[in-house]
Amino acid sequence: MVAFDANEALTPCREGRGIGAILFDRERLRQAEADLFSPQHWGSKARPVGEGGRGSAWFIDAPFGASVLRHYLRGGLAAKISHDQYLWRGADRTRSFAEFRLMRALREKKLPVPRPLAAFYMREGLRYRAAILMERIEGVRSLADRALVAGRGAPWEETGRLIARFHRAGLDHADLNAHNILFDGNGHGWLIDFDRGVIRIPATAWRERNLKRLLRSLIKLRGERSVEDVQKDYVRLRRAYDMAWNRGT
């Protein structure tokens, strides 16, 4: 987490019995209201994101630029208890504020991360729900899509070097999967979805955990490709990762 800085602005908001706040980038947004985080508010300017996630993200054509809105939803067994409610542990520990500030910290390290625009939470008692709004990277395709279409021609080495770069900066990505690795038209790689991510001292255990999670997702999303083919491509990714890590790049 990074400290509050001059380019951040914080404004309170209310919704029925709920009390919340919005943390936003004052360089991009002159002001922020809770409506920004409602897809209904945007009407036809909001389009569901089709790939990955749980149906909780939208592309937004906003006056301040092409953006992505994402609501925080629970997964697994927790979703049966509460769809979008999290235990309140303070504003700075909300999922949205933590991700907003982590993204800012990564951008300060010159890493390829979308620019966070605004983060929102609404609290009622001991529970809260949250959302985040960020800049959209135009013309990108996920590694999952590239692997399905191009197979061995997908950017495996580039992916390995990209991950090594983030790991060198200490990013422990909580959900490193093939949907969260993007490549633009110029071949530049990006990482997205930093919910529950943290900056740590680089260590083997969590780096290996990230990479194993990515391999599992590649196998799961392989389509008609064989597991053997995916594993061969992963070997190329891992070799490039190890070389970049050992060089310190």
Swiss-Prot record:
Keywords: ATP-binding, Cell inner membrane, Cell membrane, Kinase, Lipopolysaccharide biosynthesis, Membrane, Nucleotide-binding, Transferase. Pfam families: Kdo (PF06293). One of its GO terms (cellular component) is plasma membrane. GO terms for molecular function: ATP binding; protein kinase activity. One of its GO terms (biological process) is lipopolysaccharide core region biosynthetic process. It catalyses: an alpha-Kdo-(2->6)-lipid IVA + ATP = a 4-O-phospho-alpha-Kdo-(2->6)-lipid IVA + ADP + H(+). It is a peripheral membrane protein. Pathway: Bacterial outer membrane biogenesis; LPS core biosynthesis. It is found in: Cell inner membrane. It comes from the Bacteria. InterPro entries: KDO_kinase, Kinase-like_dom_sf. Its EC number is 2.7.1.166. It is an enzyme of class 2 (transferase). The keyword 4Fe-4S does not apply. The active site is at D175. HAMAP family: KDO_kinase. Catalyzes the ATP-dependent phosphorylation of the 3-deoxy-D-manno-octulosonic acid (Kdo) residue in Kdo-lipid IV(A) at the 4-OH position. Belongs to the protein kinase superfamily. KdkA/RfaP family. This is 3-deoxy-D-manno-octulosonic acid kinase.
